Amino acid sequence: MVRLLASEVQQLLHNKFVVVLGDSVHRAVYKDLVLLLQKDCLLTNKQLRTKGELSFEKDQLMMGGELDTLHNRTDYREVREFCSDHHLVRFYFLTRVYSEYMESVLKELQSGNHAPDVIIMNSCLWDVSRYGRNSLSSYRQNLENLFGRMDEVLPKSCLLVWNTAMPLGDKIKAAFLPQKCKGQYPRISVATLKKKVTQANFYSHAEATKHYFDVLDLNFHFRQARKHLQGDGVHWNEHAHRKLSYLLLAHMADAWGVELPHRDPWEPGFEAWESSGQVEERQPQDNIGPQFAQSPPYPFPRPPPLLPSPGLPIRPPPLLGCPLPPPQPMPPLPLYPQVSYFSSDPVFQSDEFYIHSDSPSSNHTGYAFEGDFSFYPQPPMPNFRPPCHQRQAPVVHRGFPRHFPRGPYMPWRERPRRPQKHAPACLESRPQ
């Protein structure tokens, strides 16, 4: 897992315009990026739950929220923006993947002074739960309209990352879901909602790759991390959102060809971030005693132990066996040139990620599965690095195979050339 400090995130997003589009889950994605651009700390539970505030960590509420009225209707609006000397991050709250409001957002991005460099987007839960019984079919049609317009409006240098909807809990108590009251649709069951989310993720993945956009499968990454869910069964705690930010930043670095630093996963600065999966309100920093003081932001690597632990008994040396006769000389073998072993896939270490193909697994349709992410530090392992240099990359679905352009300033979303088909050569009869 790639772990980044605030100074490194500032360098990666230097002079970049990042746009986040989505619901309340992606509002927390926006907040964690804004926080990580300024300091090395996590979001508090209060910051995660608050919506529509006038200011958050030096950002500004541009429209909606507390400037208008806080409610849970489908016409809720909230636009936030964080702007510094070299960074610009903007958030648009969406209740539907494509609508008249989404069209106005696209026109605003197209006519603005700065074209977006990165767009992080997801819209699913509101679409499949608040727009009637045929919401899934309309969601599929809206996906086609959205990605078609994105392909027309966005410049080829813009990196669009579509996030799949994250897993849901067994008990859902989110406030935006429809209630059993007069004039509204009946409350959807948890099993039905989970099934709709799975189908919606499949449709969005297929439509995004059809238009050569990237897909980050958050449903896969967090499928076994439900202990980091909030009590409502929809939103996630600060540890999960920091993991999510790392995945997004590693995806951007891989797309731009930026080499990220290789950091020891056992650094104490990151141990504290992932050591807890509880969802409790954290105490202020003034109440923390000296024994719980946080580690410095730039810790030194932990040296390996020189002597065995005093609590463990020292094993005696093994007994020597009977002396063996000297080996007989072998006849000389003919010398042949050494054949190196080549593999079609690059070799990755256990603490690195890889980019897998788009071929679906045999057990699940439309998704590829790998090893789980660990939210707790693992026992230290000896660091044996191969002689060759290897890049870290997140597990992502690529809309097209990796293509290396000729020049350094080629567009990002350029479609690969189709291979030319040659006529089959005539088969000649072999001499008997």
Curated annotation (Swiss-Prot):
This is PC-esterase domain-containing protein 1B. The lineage of its organism: Eukaryota, Metazoa, Chordata, Craniata, Vertebrata. Residues 285-294 have a biased composition (Polar residues). Residues 273-312, 407-432 are annotated as: Disordered. InterPro entries: SGNH_hydro_sf. PANTHER family: PC-ESTERASE DOMAIN-CONTAINING PROTEIN 1B, SARCOMA ANTIGEN NY-SAR-23. The gene is Pced1b. Belongs to the PC-esterase family. Residues 296-312 have a biased composition (Pro residues). Disulfide bonds: none annotated.
